[in-house]
Amino acid sequence: MCKGIFITATGTDVGKTYITARIIKGLIAQGINAGYYKAALSGTEVEAGKKIAGDAAYVFRFAGIKGEPNQAVTTMLDYPASPHLAAQMENKRITLAPIIQDFDRAASIYDYVVMEGSGGIICPLNLEGTTLMLVDVIKALALEIVIVADAGLGTINSTLLTLEYARSMKIDTRCIVLNRFDESSAIHCDNKKVIETMTGLEVLVCGVQGDLDILLIKKILLANLLDSI
C-alpha cells in the first residue's frame, strides 16, 4: 500500500524543493522505495535543447531517482508565475482528474510518494470555471503535509498562519521543517522553541550546511507505514 506526504511551504523560495530532495534521498538511503511527484510546475528550463521541469530534474539528480523527471510532473508551464496565471497565459487548464491519475501512477511505482507543492499552501491552480486550489488536491489525495519555512525573522507569523489555514481546511500537518537554520542564532533557536510550544508539533531543522535528521524524518513520515522504524 502506497503512503505519501505533501511538502508545502510558507511561501516561494524558502527551500521546499531542496527539503523535498533531501527527504527522498534520505528515505532511499534507508531502503525505502521513495519517489517524487508534482502536480504543476511554472517556469520550465531548457537543458541540452530540451524543455525540462527544473524542480523535478533537481530532485531526481540529488536523490538518485531513476527515470524521466518530466514524467513526474502533470502540467509543465513555461511562464514563471502562479500556476493559474501561467496556465491562462498558455491557454491551458489545470484540472483535478489528471493529477489524481498521475499520483496513482506514481503510487504504483513507489512505496512512498513525496509530492511537492507549488509556492505556498494557498495556491490557485485554476480560477476559470471550476476553481481548483492546491488544498483541493491535498484533500482529494488524502495526504498529510510537511510545512517548510525559513528559520529567520518573521517565520513565527508565516508558519502559524500556514498551519492554521491547513487546520481550518481539515488537513493534518505531520511536522514543520525550518530551513537554513543556524544554531548559533538566538533568533533561529527562539523561533524553533516558540513554534513548537504554540503548535504542539515537532519542528525539525535543516542547517546552513544542509544537514537534516533523516532518521527522525523517517520515523515521523513512515510511522504508519512500517511496523518497525
Label every PLM stretch briefly:
Residues 23, 112, 117-203:
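Conserved catalytic-core segment of NTP-binding enzymes
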Residues 10, 39, 150, 178-181, ...:
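Cofactor-binding loop segments of dinucleotide-utilizing enzymes, especially the Rossmann-like FAD-
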